[in-house]
């Protein structure tokens, strides 16, 4: 159980890296939404919310990336005029998971360690 959780936490830290890169590029993110198989896991949702320090929303659609691709295709062929319009017409929220304050405090302390270790370990898989 500990090893599985460690893998999930490592992936969550990697996603936080990506989120911070987007924010550094000036991309404004107001909501974090999950879909697909992993979104069904309460543990995964709690880890993500706690690592990010903000709520994550789960969508009713379970198709994951295929759903997003279908929306993009719909915009491409003129079903909707824009991605925001397509999302407004089709995306429905199922649940919101708030960060656990205790977990968030621990992750906030561990994340800088992850940031130092990640590049140090890179030669082993590069």
Model-derived segments and spans:
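Glycine/Thr-rich phosphate-binding loops that ligate phosphate moieties of nucleotide
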Residues: 1-126
């Amino acid at each position: 159980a500990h090893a599985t959780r460690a893998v999930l936490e490592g992936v969550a830290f990697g996603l936080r890296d990506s989120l911070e890169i987007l924010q550094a590029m000036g991309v404004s993110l107001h909501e974090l939404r999950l879909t697909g198989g992993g979104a069904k896991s309460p543990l995964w949702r709690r880890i993500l919310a706690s690592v990010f320090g903000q709520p994550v929303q789960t969508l009713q659609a379970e198709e994951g990336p295929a759903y997003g691709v279908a929306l993009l295709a719909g915009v491409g062929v003129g079903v909707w005029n824009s991605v925001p319009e397509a999302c407004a017409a089709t995306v429905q929220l199922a649940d919101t998971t708030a960060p656990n304050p205790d977990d968030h405090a621990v992750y906030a302390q561990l994340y800088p360690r992850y940031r130092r270790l990640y590049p140090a370990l890179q030669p082993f898989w590069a």
